[in-house]
Amino acid sequence: MPEILNHTLILEKIKNLGASPGCYLWKSKKGEVLYVGKAKNLDKRVRSYLKENHPDVKTKVLQREIFDLDWIATGTEKEALILEATLIKKHNPRFNVRLKDDKKYPYICVSLSEPYPMVYVTRKLKDNGDRYFGPYSDVKSTRETLDIILRIFPVRKTRQVLPLPRPRRPCLNFDMGRCLGPCQGNIPVEDYKVIIDQVIQFLEGRKESLVSDLNIKMSNASERLDFEKAARYRDMLQRIQNFREKQTVVSLEGGDEDVIGFARKQDEGQVILLEIRGGRLETKKSFPIQGVLDAENSEILGAFFRDYYLNASLVPPCIFIPADIQDEVIPVIDVLQEKTGFRPKIKFPKGGDKRSLLKIAEKNAELGLSERLLATHYRDQTASLKEIQEMFSLERLPHIIECYDISHFQGSQPVASGVMFVEGKPFKQGYRKYNIQGYEGINDPGMIHEVISRRLQRIINEEGVFPDLIVIDGGLTQLTKACEAAVEAGAEGIPMVGLAKKREEIFFPGENEPFIFDMNSPGMKLLRHLRDEAHRFGVSHHRSRRNKETMRSLIQEVPDIGFKRSKLLLQHFSGEKKIEEATKEELLLVPGIGENLAEKILKQLQKKE
């Protein structure tokens, strides 16, 4: 049996499902909606989740949290698709692939419900006859598009309800020729509607027909000697031309197309949508995707296709996709055909110009995802550093943190490691290995004193930069010796703390009792990462040193080899493992090693095995 908490109750519920299409909702013990899905046959689809040893990793994880089942039957699969999108928006289930914050995507609204419509940015969609264009991927790009419209078309910008009971004094936009003054009653509703129709043409991407229409209107106005109106059309044409000159021509065919690029990493995904209108790249939209871990690319792209195009104000005749997901998108295409009256073509090009466009979209998706993950990491790391600053009452943010650890085997071959984190990330160029020189036996505090002394003296001699914080892997005794070394070096101002492994206790200089902070806080997670990295690096160095010395002593037992030749061997092969794997011919390449000595070395190495 799969690990479903309330398996018996769910089996009873399934008996009432039937074979109708609809949506199902898996719920947790607390009533949280975990996953929303749609099905042609509810009974068959829901039973598939009850399989033992399910091949899908994501479903296995979901099974462990399932406690209850709810469902809604629909008349058709198309109705189920629309309902699925609505339920995902409503419940935001964590096991569904979904657009990040899709409820908040902005649109441009043309308020056709008013006699003198406005054009503005909104996140709220009303069913009152207004036209909405979008969704746009972010409010910045939406406002940039709105700004272009308001510079090209002389539409009103005030939010007053028009017409006013009494005409008012026109605003500065009227004086500058950027508004036709509907608040003053200067323009009839019919004439203003002509301008609004042109705005809609622009937003629909029909700029060629818009330019042609404006040219005709300009000529007609000139023939009627209406030079003021002709000048207005001329200015609009010039602004549209200036806008179009900034757009890149990507298709000589001059068609309207959407090109979708996709990238993923860890649990995050990124979709880039290139809107090509009239053969020109008009808009690049970027959509973060959540919940992609363990999901197939077809599922992710299918979810995006559903969430985006079921809410899109305009759907082009052709959509290019980066993977063959026909099965996932056909139900969406069926719904779009009912809504728009035409069936958009879905293509997966494998070569030619369209494949090149897909690669551009995919490259942009990769860059966008990398930038977003970097920003998220930087934000998280900054939060961790701020917390460490507060924990230790540091004067400034600990941009540079170093950590030191001692490694030895019952006091033999003692080494130390020092690692450096810059802005919360490992900085490998700042890693240091130390062979302990002044101590033998088990004396970790003394060894820490030596290493900190050597490190600080080197910074002073080289006029380097002191770290903002030094973390000692150990307790109060080790920390005390590290502080003594800092005082002796004249660098007592460097903040130092000790981090003991046993209970993740933090020791402060001069404090006998340790402090315990929240182990799962961002600051403590970063400190543990730092300490564990120092330990890993130290153990690796200690193992290498032990192996080297073991090999050297083993080779030195060979008659006639001596210290000098054993050193030459180690230098020539640059590693103990390579010596162990060396053939007689390879040994003969080492200066001072003849056939007789090479055979003795091989015999000695066989003893080790």
From Swiss-Prot:
Gene Ontology CC annotation, any one: cytoplasm
Location in or out of the cell: Cytoplasm
A Gene Ontology BP annotation from the UniProt entry: DNA damage response
Pfam families with a match to the protein in the record: GIY-YIG, HHH_5, UVR, UvrC_RNaseH, UvrC_RNaseH_dom
Residue intervals of the GIY-YIG domain: 19-97
CDD domains: GIY-YIG_UvrC_Cho
Every UVR domain range: 208-243
Major location category of this protein: cytoplasm
One term of GO molecular function: DNA binding
Assigned keywords, A-Z: Cytoplasm, DNA damage, DNA excision, DNA repair, Excision nuclease, SOS response
NCBIfam families named in the record: PRK00558.1-5, uvrC
Function text: The UvrABC repair system catalyzes the recognition and processing of DNA lesions. UvrC both incises the 5' and 3' sides of the lesion. The N-terminal half is responsible for the 3' incision and the C-terminal half is responsible for the 5' incision.
Subunit structure comment from the entry: Interacts with UvrB in an incision complex.
Protein family membership: Belongs to the UvrC family.
Name by which UniProt lists this protein: UvrABC system protein C
